[in-house]
Amino acid sequence: MQKELKQEIINKFKLHETDTGSPEVQIALLTERINHLTEHLKVHKKDYHSRRGLLKMVGHRRGLLNYLMKTDIARYRAIVEKLNLRK
């Protein structure tokens, strides 16, 4: 992921001025990486190493979403709506 794109995502989802690690930012960054890797795997179907990385990222994002759902349901619903995620 390019530096400018990463900074743009952080700016869009940050909760306060110096926020870089909130669950919302982490979920948004993971979603971008997952989408990019999904496109890669459509072309390179036998890239099993990258597929494993994709599954790990999806699991990590799911864990962050579960944490957010347990702690603050309003923030969870907002991030799911913004990123057009299922559930």
From Swiss-Prot:
Part of the 30S ribosomal subunit. Forms a bridge to the 50S subunit in the 70S ribosome, contacting the 23S rRNA. InterPro entries: Ribosomal_uS15, Ribosomal_uS15_bac-type, uS15_NS1_RNA-bd_sf. It holds the Pfam family Ribosomal_S15. Belongs to the universal ribosomal protein uS15 family. The keyword rRNA-binding applies. This is Small ribosomal subunit protein uS15. It comes from Acetivibrio thermocellus (strain ATCC 27405 / DSM 1237 / JCM 9322 / NBRC 103400 / NCIMB 10682 / NRRL B-4536 / VPI 7372). GO terms for cellular component: cytosolic small ribosomal subunit. It comes from the Bacteria. Keywords: Ribonucleoprotein, Ribosomal protein, RNA-binding, rRNA-binding. One of its GO terms (biological process) is translation. CDD domains: Ribosomal_S15p_S13e. Disulfide bonds: none annotated. The gene is rpsO. GO terms for molecular function: rRNA binding; structural constituent of ribosome. SUPFAM superfamilies: S15/NS1 RNA-binding domain. One of the primary rRNA binding proteins, it binds directly to 16S rRNA where it helps nucleate assembly of the platform of the 30S subunit by binding and bridging several RNA helices of the 16S rRNA. Forms an intersubunit bridge (bridge B4) with the 23S rRNA of the 50S subunit in the ribosome.
